Every structure is written in structure tokens, then in C-alpha cells.
């Protein structure tokens, strides 16, 4: 019971050490990834992993829950305070599980769901045909304007009036602009639909007051905790009190069994951090960094190489890059940046002609680097490395760019001293 991981399972210990090295020495720019604080890692690696706690605080189906009840209540209260919500459920294991529970609570199988088309930046759980949301419900979709790549709310309204959905989802996985939540609310009211906002990507910006909050407009709001919120991988739900009973029942027993109390403890810690001035400063640097990258990728030397930025910029933490006129496709561009020490993900652009495993675009995010401490100076350097790689293509001097990326990474140490307290230690 007391032997360290390196002794019990040296194979896993070695892989953890290698992954720590990768995270330290490269620039993480996948928009949905971040670095959980040490305090969150400690909470999630705690003895709470041993505790079963089916039910809600004060209404458990197991004994011995006096301490985990307090943990969950702290997490719920912090979520409500942070987002100005009437109720919170912090038990969903993920953002996808949160969406499943909300739809379970608000709809019945066969009823109509309207969401952003996956090909235009939507998420799998917003009606993709192979996902549960595409199998259980009848789906309609809205998209972006082919010319501006922006969501046209008049078009959304026209679609909603024709389709008459039971639930409208406002949210995205790859859309670089702020949504008009008031307009979505108006449309939902006009057609008699409930409004679910999926703020998984921009919840941290909302918490910092740097992005409009969907909470006053939505019936229910779902989110992850690990993207811009910067906690551990998990989900939560906030919203109006009138939906609390239905959503609590949809989470348990509708979708899940026992909650992961160690993960809920990590959520509580992350939510406490998200209420601090330091967190707000990190979100400001996240936004500024994304704008710096977008501006650099729209410069003439990059545009000449056939690279463009979807919608002509960004309002959030990510930049969506269009490579349709470039010699590079999304896979090739992802691989090239990987070689120079920058991790991004290939991503479809609106109405992408290439298959999903190749794509014609990149999604580039700034949250993880802002968490490391990057500011405008560092983001300007990162932007130039990316721009040089994409504009030059396969003939670029990979070694020179990798040296620049590595110097940046090592200037901002990540998890300094982690080996001394973690199970990875030798």
C-alpha cells in the first residue's frame, strides 16, 4: 500500500515522467487543453478517490459521507457564486456527460434538437449523427455565413421557426467569436424552446468578466472545468432553480452512478482559484495572446502563402486557421508545428472539403501558455514561429524554430519540483 509508483509499476512511472518532460519542453496550444494547478492535482490524487457517494449531499445512499458532503457543497456554492447561477450540479464526469444529462432532463427521445453544425464549428454532443445526441433526437442545424464565417442570427431564427425544436444549443467547439445570447434567448422564446448554452470553451473568460455571461439568458448552462477554467478534466452544470430537480435526477441515476469525489474536490479548488485576481489576469493574457496570433497570421507574408484566419480574427482564446489555399493541409501543418515544438490540432474549417482526419485547418489556443505565464512579448514570439512555419512550409528550418520554441518553454518552468512530491519521483 505504501510503495511508490516507480517501484510498483516502473513502466507507467517512466511514461508519466516522459509526459511531464513533453509538457515542460514544448508549447501546448491545443485550445481545449490547459495545465491544472498543483493544488488541483493534489486534490484529484487524494484519498477521496476511495469514497463512494451516490446521491447528493445530505441524501446519500452510502454512509461515511460527512466530509465529502462538505466538499461537494463547497464546489456547488463556488460554482453558483462564480457564475451567478441559481443552482449547480458538479457531478458530471465530463462536458459531454453534462450535455447528455441536460438533454435527458429537458427532452424526450425523438424530440427536436437544434445546434451548430459540426462542419461549422459545433460539438459532437450538439447533434452529430454518430453521437448519442444524433441517435436519440431529431436534429436540425444552423451554420455560419459562407462569406463572413459568422453565425447569422436572422438565419438561426428562420431555421428555428421552420424546425420548431424542443431545445436550442448555443455553443461551439471551433468558433472564434462571441455568441449573441440575448438573440438566442429571444428565438427560443419565440418558438417555445428551452435554451442550453454550452460554454465549455469560454467558461474561464466568463468567470473573469471578459466574455458575456450566458447565465442570465439560458435555461441551463453546461461546461467543462479543464479548458479556460484550468482545472481537472470534468464537467458541471449551472442554471435556473426550476430545472434543478430534473437535472439532478438526469445526472444520477439517469446518466451516472457514484460521483468521483476526488475530481469534485479538484473542481472545488479550481473554482476557488477562478475567483481570484490572478486568474482574471491570466484570462486577459489568454485573450491578448489569441489576438496577437490572429494578427500575425493575417500579415501579408503569411497571406501570400495561402494562409488565412477564419472570420478575420478572434474574440476568444482560439484562432481558427484556414489552409485551403496553402500547400499544407491540416494534418501536414499539425505535424510541422509538432516538429518545431508546438502542439496544436488539425481542425475542419467551415464546410471543409477534406476528410476529418486530414482537414483544411488548424485550431490554435492560448490558455495553456497563459497559465505558464506568457504575456504579449512571448505570444508575439510564438506567433512569429507559427507564422514562419506555415508561410515557409516543408522547406522551413525546423531546427532553428524548435530552438526558439524550446527556449520559450524553458523560460517558464512547469510544475517545478513535481518529482519531489509526486509518485513519479525516482
UniProtKB/Swiss-Prot annotation:
It catalyses: (6R)-5,10-methylene-5,6,7,8-tetrahydrofolate + glycine + H2O = (6S)-5,6,7,8-tetrahydrofolate + L-serine. The keyword Endoplasmic reticulum does not apply. Disulfide bonds: none annotated. (6S)-5,6,7,8-tetrahydrofolate binds at residues 118, 122-124. Its main location: cytoplasm. Pathway: One-carbon metabolism; tetrahydrofolate interconversion; Amino-acid biosynthesis; glycine biosynthesis; glycine from L-serine: step 1/1. The gene is glyA1. One of its GO terms (cellular component) is cytosol. The keyword Repressor does not apply. GO terms for molecular function: glycine hydroxymethyltransferase activity; pyridoxal phosphate binding. It comes from Mycobacterium bovis (strain ATCC BAA-935 / AF2122/97). The modification N6-(pyridoxal phosphate)lysine is found at residue 227. PANTHER family: SERINE HYDROXYMETHYLTRANSFERASE (PTHR11680), SERINE HYDROXYMETHYLTRANSFERASE 1 (PTHR11680:SF35). It is an enzyme of class 2 (transferase). Belongs to the SHMT family. The lineage of its organism: Bacteria, Bacillati, Actinomycetota, Actinomycetes, Mycobacteriales. Catalyzes the reversible interconversion of serine and glycine with tetrahydrofolate (THF) serving as the one-carbon carrier. This reaction serves as the major source of one-carbon groups required for the biosynthesis of purines, thymidylate, methionine, and other important biomolecules. Also exhibits THF-independent aldolase activity toward beta-hydroxyamino acids, producing glycine and aldehydes, via a retro-aldol mechanism. Gene3D superfamilies: Aspartate Aminotransferase, domain 1 (3.90.1150.10), Type I PLP-dependent aspartate aminotransferase-like (Major domain) (3.40.640.10). InterPro entries: PyrdxlP-dep_Trfase, PyrdxlP-dep_Trfase_major, PyrdxlP-dep_Trfase_small, Ser_HO-MeTrfase, Ser_HO-MeTrfase-like, Ser_HO-MeTrfase_PLP_BS, SHMT-like_dom. Homodimer. It is found in: Cytoplasm. This is Serine hydroxymethyltransferase 1. The record marks 226 as: Plays an important role in substrate specificity. Keywords: Amino-acid biosynthesis, Cytoplasm, One-carbon metabolism, Pyridoxal phosphate, Transferase.
Amino acid at each position: 500500500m505504501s510503495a511508490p509508483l516507480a517501484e510498483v509499476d516502473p513502466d507507467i512511472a517512466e511514461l508519466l515522467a516522459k509526459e511531464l518532460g513533453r509538457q515542460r519542453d514544448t508549447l501546448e496550444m491545443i485550445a481545449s487543453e490547459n495545465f491544472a494547478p498543483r493544488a488541483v492535482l493534489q486534490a484529484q490524487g487524494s484519498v477521496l478517490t476511495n469514497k463512494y457517494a451516490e446521491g447528493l449531499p445530505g441524501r446519500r445512499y452510502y454512509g461515511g459521507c460527512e466530509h465529502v458532503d462538505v466538499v461537494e457543497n463547497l464546489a456547488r456554492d463556488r460554482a453558483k457564486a462564480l457564475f451567478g447561477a441559481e443552482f449547480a450540479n458538479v457531478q458530471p464526469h465530463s462536458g459531454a456527460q453534462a450535455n447528455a444529462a441536460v438533454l435527458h432532463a429537458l427532452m424526450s427521445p425523438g424530440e427536436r434538437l437544434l445546434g451548430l453544425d459540426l462542419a461549422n464549428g459545433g460539438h459532437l454532443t450538439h447533434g452529430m449523427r454518430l453521437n448519442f445526441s444524433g441517435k436519440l433526437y431529431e436534429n436540425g442545424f444552423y451554420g455560419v455565413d459562407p462569406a463572413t464565417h459568422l453565425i447569422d442570427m436572422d438565419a438561426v431564427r428562420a431555421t428555428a421557426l421552420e424546425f420548431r425544436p424542443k431545445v436550442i444549443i448555443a455553443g461551439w467547439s471551433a468558433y472564434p467569436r462571441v455568441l449573441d445570447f440575448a438573440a438566442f434567448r429571444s428565438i427560443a422564446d419565440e418558438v417555445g424552446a428551452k435554451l442550453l448554452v454550452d460554454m465549455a470553451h469560454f467558461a474561464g473568460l466568463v468567470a473573469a468578466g471578459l466574455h458575456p455571461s450566458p447565465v442570465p439568458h439560458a435555461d441551463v448552462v453546461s461546461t467543462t472545468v479543464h479548458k479556460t477554467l484550468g482545472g481537472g478534466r470534468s464537467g458541471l452544470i449551472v442554471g435556473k432553480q426550476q430545472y434543478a430537480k430534473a437535472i439532478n435526477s438526469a445526472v444520477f441515476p439517469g446518466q451516472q452512478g457514484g460521483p468521483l469525489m476526488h475530481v469534485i474536490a479538484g473542481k472545488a479548488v479550481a473554482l476557488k482559484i477562478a475567483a481570484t485576481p490572478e486568474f482574471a489576469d491570466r484570462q486577459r493574457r489568454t485573450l491578448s495572446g489569441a489576438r496577437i496570433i490572429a494578427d500575425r497570421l493575417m500579415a501579408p507574408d503569411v497571406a501570400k502563402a495561402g494562409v488565412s484566419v477564419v472570420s478575420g480574427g478572434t474574440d476568444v482564446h482560439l484562432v481558427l486557421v484556414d489552409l485551403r489555399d496553402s500547400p499544407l493541409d491540416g494534418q501536414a501543418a499539425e505535424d510541422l508545428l509538432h516538429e518545431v515544438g508546438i502542439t496544436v490540432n488539425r481542425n475542419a474549417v467551415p464546410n471543409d472539403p477534406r476528410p476529418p482526419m486530414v482537414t483544411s485547418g488548424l485550431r490554435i489556443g492560448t490558455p495553456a501558455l497563459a497559465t505558464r505565464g506568457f504575456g504579449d512579448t512571448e505570444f508575439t514570439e510564438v506567433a512569429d514561429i507559427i507564422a514562419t512555419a506555415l508561410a515557409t512550409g516543408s522547406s522551413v528550418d525546423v531546427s532553428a524554430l524548435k530552438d526558439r520554441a524550446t527556449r520559450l518553454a524553458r523560460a517558464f518552468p512547469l510544475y517545478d519540483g513535481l518529482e519531489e512530491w509526486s509518485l513519479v519521483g525516482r
